[in-house]
Amino acid sequence: MDSWNKTAWKSLFVPGGILLFLTLILLKTGWLTVTPAMLTFLYYAGLLAGFLLAWRFHSSRVFFALLVLFLAQQAIGLFFSGPLRGPAHAALEATIFLVPLNFVLLSLARERGFTPASVSSTLIFLFVQSTIVAALARAGQDYPPMAHAPSHVAPLLSSPYARMGFGIAAVLLLIRFVLLRKPAESAFFWSLTSFVLAVHSGGVGRTATAYFVTCTMILAFSIIETSYLLAYHDELTTLPSRRAFQDTLLSIAVPYSIAVLDIDHFKRFNDTYGHQIGDQVLRVVAKYLQDGIREGDLAARYGGEELMCILPGASLEICRQVADRIRARVAGARVTRRGTGQEIGQVTISTGVAQFKPGESFEALIERCDEALYQAKQSGRNCTIAAAA
């Protein structure tokens, strides 16, 4: 499993699943000694932090998910300010139904940032829902009166419609995560689960507030996790990024060797077949690189059509052999246009390799490797050249 997929699958449980699990442990064991006032403060602090992070990183989906949770929590709290009779019963049912619906819709939506059109349309949609809930709260529906106690919210989850709604939403959110494997999709699932537990615990009070705090933390942390993925992984090739490569070089133990691979005539593929074919070629070469390195080696996209790998403990000759084996496999591959099966020509790579010298700077090592790559290009391409020891 490549580095991107490992990190992506880890995000199914980290941080959302772990945060919710820790909350459950603290509540069930009685170790949560925070006062209700402090929990309320943490809830609003987490909400504010989530809003700021979502705005700063242009994550409108998470921003509006936090807004949905805030509106739902406020609605549940408001209904307990007076007699909880039939109309409030209907409004609570609507609130509990609308939260999973909105989470699914936000998960299915494309991330469009905070453009005026997307913000206004989403706010209007949420305003209409809020109006419906308010209208239900004022309507004279003939529902059985409910006692003024938080414990009477939990039975709403026993409704077959509520169970079906949460079940369908949970399945859809999990499917979205499996398809996309991104932190936001995982956060929607775990945050919705925490919301269900908040409602099940009564909707208001110390336990419910703890679950609402967890909801906000899960969504806020998903933005940080997404930022990490964008900084340290290349989404196109699923390889680690240049930053991850450089950070590894700063911490790796000697001896080690590196290889730089450059796709021959890459511009020709882009100019002849279009950028989509160029991206396909890049993904194919990245796949051969990832499959061809040894256990413990690191492959990364360094920039453009240039890929690099670090081979810890490898001599210059071992590095050359590994790189040349990858080069030969790429040259022997048959690359075709997706959908039509049209062959797009032979793809070849040129490779330069170098071994770290004691006392050598990172920049000097990369420069020697680039010089070896240049020699490979000058030698007719589709070959591997080792830098002078």
Task: Specify the residue positions occupied by each region the protein language model found.
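Regulatory sensory/coupling modules that transmit signals to nucleotide-handling catalytic cores
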Residues: 1-228
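Catalytic-core segments of nucleotide cyclases and related cyclic-nucleotide turnover enzymes
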Residues: 320, 354-388
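A short pre-motif secondary-structure segment
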Residues: 298-301
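Catalytic strand-loop-helix junctions within cyclic-nucleotide turnover domains
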Residues: 310-321, 338-342, 349-365
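Alpha-helical scaffold within the catalytic cores of cyclic-nucleotide enzymes
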Residues: 286, 318-339, 349, 368-370
